[in-house]
Amino acid sequence: MAATNDPELTRRKQRQEDFLRGTSKINFDDHIDHCVLSGKTAIVTGGASGIGHGIAQALSSNGCKVAVLDLSGPLEAGTDESNIDSPKLFECDVSSWESLLAAFQEVLIWSGNSLDIVVLSAGVRSHNIKDLILERPAGSTSTPVKPPSSVFDVNLLGTYYSAYLALWYFTNLEAKRDEAEFNWKPQLLFIGSLASYVEQPLSADYCASKHGVRGLWKSVRSHSALFGDCQTNLLAPTFIDNRQGSTKSRGDGALISLTNDVKLGEVSDVVAGALRCLCDRNIEGRALCCVKGEQSSPGSNNFDLCDNLIDFNAGKSVLDSFRNGVVGRLGTQNTTGPQ
C-alpha cells in the first residue's frame, strides 16, 4: 500500500507523538529571574501554614501581591498582616463551592481585577484505614460507620474547585492582560505528593486524593492554551517537615519512623521547586519531585519526574530516585535518615 501524503494525517501523528513525549524536561541549570514575580497577583490556597505558607511568603518577598485562602485563624509566624506588602488572609473553606467562589471574587476586587498565579496547596492529612476499621471503640455495634470524607473534600474536591476557578478567571481576564513585560503567562501550580506516584500504606484516602490531583493536572496540562494560555505544572513533595508553627504536623515518633525509609525534606525545598516552575517560562506541563536538598542549598536534589507515557508515566524516574538514594532507600539500601 502506498504511503499517504495527507498533511492533516501527518499533523495528527505529530500531535500524538508530542502528547506521548510531553514537553521539554526541566533544566535545573537554567537561571531563573525572580523579578518576573514583581507586581503579580497570586492566590495560595492553604497558605496559612506549612508548604502553602512557605510559598506565599516567598512570593510576597519577591514583590507579589499574595492572597491566602484558608480557614479562619492567624497566619504562621513571620507574616505581618498589618504590612500592606504581606500576604493577606481571605477566610474560606476550599471544599465549599460557595465559600471558595466568594473568596475568589473578594480577591479580584482587592487586586483590581488582576490574577496571575494560583497555587493549589490546601490539603489535610490522611486517616489510617486500618484504625478506622479495626480499632473500633469498645461497645460499638457491628454496623459499619461512615468513614470521614474530609481528605477527599479538601485535597481533591477543593483542588478541583480551585483549579476550575483559576482556569475560568485566567480565560476571562486574558483580554486585559499586558504580556509585554517578561512575556508572562498565567501560572497554575498543583501541589500533589510523592503519594501521587508511590503507595503510602493504609493512607487510602490521602493516596487516592493525591492520585486524583495528578489526574486532574494531567487532564488539562496539554490544553492550557484554551484557558488564557496559562502554564500548568505539578509539585510532588516527599515527606516534608512542616512542624514549625504548623497545625498539620506529625508527632516526632511518626517522623522518626517514616524517615527510616524516606528522607525528610524541608518546606524550603518545596519553595525552591515552586519558584523554579513559576519563574521559568520553559517549564510547562512538568511534574517536579521536591526532596531533601543539600546543606544550605534548598531544592538542590529536586528532579523532573518525567510523567509522560513515553517515559513510563514517571515510573522509571521514581524507581531510580529510590535506587540512587535521592528520595530514600529501597530494600536494604542505606539512607541518611532524618537530617
From Swiss-Prot:
Q: A single Gene Ontology molecular function, please?
A: oxidoreductase activity, acting on the CH-OH group of donors, NAD or NADP as acceptor
Where, per UniProt, does this protein localize? Cytoplasm, Cytosol
Q: Which family does it belong to?
A: Belongs to the short-chain dehydrogenases/reductases (SDR) family.
Record's subunit section: Homodimer.
Q: Which organism is it from?
A: Phoma sp. (strain ATCC 20986 / MF5453)
Specify whether Glycoprotein is a keyword of the entry: no
Lineage of producing organism: Eukaryota, Fungi, Dikarya, Ascomycota, Pezizomycotina
Protein name in the entry:
NADP-dependent dehydrogenase M3
Q: Which UniProt keywords apply?
A: Cytoplasm, NADP, Oxidoreductase
The task this protein performs is described as: NADP-dependent dehydrogenase; part of the gene cluster that mediates the biosynthesis of squalestatin S1 (SQS1, also known as zaragozic acid A), a heavily oxidized fungal polyketide that offers potent cholesterol lowering activity by targeting squalene synthase (SS). SQS1 is composed of a 2,8-dioxobicyclic[3.2.1]octane-3,4,5-tricarboxyclic acid core that is connected to two lipophilic polyketide arms.
> Gene encoding this chain?
M3
